[in-house]
């Protein structure tokens, strides 16, 4: 499974990178899942995605999520609307929250997957390096803890990650990068409470991932407008040359 960034109108260089990743991925997979909310309105954003889908021969499964929030008659109307604008391989109304039709989604994925060699062992869950996963866990916990207090313009990089000799513990030093001084204060919180919360939540999940004790230390730095800096974007692991 490749969970691509959402296709959107980019407002900075990082956004452009994310959109390029999503659009390039369309040619590299065996089946595409397009997740939409229940609506019969197809705006410029949706139309742009449809135009991108027309450029590839990959089968596309449209998943209309959150159908538990609308009447059954409306669902039929939404399906008809999307059928008129693109020849989808399948259209599946579903609800991730209520686990409605999720089995059908999985079955349809297998229907369109070709047989091929097993590239990874059965117990392999990802091909990403541990440092990248740890950084993403910290960023995820930060975004959850901060909710809507700051934009998603934060990044995390791992300064140091090393196991202690003869001990079942790993020391991890990481930096949370934001774009504004005001954001730094919010991330740290009163008396460091917010940063402590982020660290505690991240540490718990990292310990589960690595199956060892973790000593996690977090710092917060301001890099003004880093999302428009090619150098910083690349340093944070978003390398456009690898798309």
Language-model features and meaning:
Residues 3, 22, 33, 95, ...:
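Conserved RecA-like P-loop NTPase ATPase core
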Residues 13-24, 41-44, 48, 70-77, ...:
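Charged, alpha-helix-enriched surfaces in structured cytosolic catalytic cores
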Residues 10, 25-32, 56, 85-88, ...:
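Conserved, well-folded catalytic cores of nucleic-acid-processing
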Residues 58-61, 67-130:
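Canonical P-loop GTPase G-domain recognition
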Residues 16-91, 145, 162-171:
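Conserved C-terminal guanine-recognition region of P-loop GTPase G domains, centered on the G4
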Residues 1-15, 19, 38:
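Switch II (G3) loop of P-loop NTPases
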Residues 130-243:
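P-loop NTP-binding site
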């Amino acid at each position: 499974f490749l969970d691509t960034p959402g296709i959107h109108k980019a407002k900075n260089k990082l956004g452009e990178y994310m959109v390029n990743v999503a659009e390039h991925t369309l040619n590299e997979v065996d089946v595409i899942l397009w997740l939409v909310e229940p609506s019969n309105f197809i705006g410029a954003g949706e139309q742009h995605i449809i135009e991108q889908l027309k450029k590839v021969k990959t089968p596309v499964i449209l998943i209309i999520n959150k159908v538990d929030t609308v009447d059954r008659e409306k669902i039929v109307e939404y399906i008809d609307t999307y059928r008129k604008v693109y020849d989808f391989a399948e259209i599946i109304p579903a609800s991730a929250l209520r686990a409605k039709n999720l089995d059908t989604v999985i079955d349809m994925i297998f229907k369109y997957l070709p047989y091929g060699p097993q590239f990874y062992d059965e117990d392999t869950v990802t091909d990403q390096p541990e440092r990248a996963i740890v950084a993403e866990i910290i960023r995820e916990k930060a975004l959850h803890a901060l909710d809507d207090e700051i934009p998603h313009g934060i990044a995390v990089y791992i300064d140091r990650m090393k196991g202690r000799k003869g001990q079942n513990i790993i020391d991890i030093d990481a930096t949370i990068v934001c774009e504004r001084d005001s954001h730094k204060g919010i991330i740290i919180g009163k008396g460091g409470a917010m940063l402590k919360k982020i660290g505690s939540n991240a540490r718990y999940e990292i310990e589960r991932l690595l199956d060892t004790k973790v000593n996690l230390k977090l710092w917060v730095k301001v890099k003004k407008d880093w999302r428009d800096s090619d150098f910083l974007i690349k340093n944070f692991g978003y390398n456009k040359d690898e798309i």
